[in-house]
Amino acid sequence: APVVAKLAKDKGILTVGVVTKPFRFEAKTRMNNAMSGIEKLRDSVDTLIVIPNDKILEIVDKRTSMPEALMKADEVLQQAVQGITDLINVPAVINLDFADVQTVMRDKGIAHIGIGEGKGDDKAVMAVKAAVESPLLETTIAGATDIIINVSGDISMFDASDAVDYVREITGD
């Protein structure tokens, strides 16, 4: 993957990697190989999103089977990739084009991506809060230099403004 990513990046193609780190209970060799691969990939892509499998243990029940937990890990990866592609491909009230996404993701290194849902009066803030505080990620948005917030659903301009204000408060912007 790092070789293909580097070739694409060298041609000016925006490259985004989304990877998982093995569970701690897996063989040490597997973790060492994964960490080595992540380091190589980090140098070969514009943006890298790393999701530690151990974080899945924080969102599943103790009775969750191993296959179900691994399916959850796959879902998280799928949501991350889908979220990025939807920014460009799915029409929205405020549309982003590929240039906007490139500006935020080109040569940025490790990134944070979160997905959240909310209901009720503060649904937009609840959704953004859930996204930025996702237990599945090791990163934080504190100090982030570039951010894309994609809020969908039946929300008002005030809801959207409140959600952005919440993010600005965290990032110090």
Question: Which residue ranges define each predicted feature?
Answer:
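Tubulin/FtsZ superfamily GTPase core signature
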Residues: A1-D173
